[in-house]
């Protein structure tokens, strides 16, 4: 398996949701035999979003939070430069949802991925998902 996909915990045999992905990354995932959905059709144990700017990030993050299973894996990807998104603005946006980044993986020369978990500082202990229950993330490293 591709080492980047391994770091992202993308494994074959599961349906995953990847929103707004660049074509080259999407093809890389599909070449590994992973069942990729590009539109929200169900609930998923793995959701990854690619946002080029804050406005797009807010929309995609809302979509992701409505599609993620309670103990799902959630990744937020943004460009390394040339946009209004950077590490500080991404972490500020995540904090609005009581989410936090727990790991960072460079995908290539353009994109950075942040593994998201529910913030331990949150009063209610998790983000209410559309499926019911609280998203906490599964980070265990």
Predicted regions and their residues:
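N-terminal, charge-rich interaction modules
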Residues: 1-27, 31
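Short acidic low-complexity segments
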Residues: 34-44
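Short, glycine-rich nucleotide/cofactor-binding loops
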Residues: 47-57
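Beta-hairpin (beta-strand-turn-beta-strand) motif
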Residues: 52, 79-81, 107, 119
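Mid-chain, well-packed structural core segment of small domains
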Residues: 58-94
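Long, charge-dense
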Residues: 91-93, 97-121
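Flexible, glycine-/basic-rich loop-and-beta segments that form/coincide
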Residues: 120-141
């Amino acid at each position: 398996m591709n080492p980047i996909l391994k770091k992202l915990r993308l494994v074959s045999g599961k349906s995953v949701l990847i929103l707004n992905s660049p074509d080259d990354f999407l093809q890389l995932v599909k070449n590994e035999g992973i069942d990729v959905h590009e539109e929200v059709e169900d609930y998923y144990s793995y959701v990854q979003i690619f946002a080029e700017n804050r406005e797009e990030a807010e929309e995609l993050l809302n979509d992701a939070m409505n599609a993620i299973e309670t103990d799902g894996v959630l990744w937020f990807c943004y460009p390394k430069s040339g946009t209004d998104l950077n590490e500080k603005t991404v972490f500020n946006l995540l904090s609005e949802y009581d989410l936090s980044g727990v790991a960072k993986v460079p995908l290539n020369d353009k994109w950075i991925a942040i593994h998201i978990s529910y913030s331990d500082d949150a009063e209610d202990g998790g983000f209410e998902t559309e499926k019911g229950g609280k998203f906490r993330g599964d980070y265990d490293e």
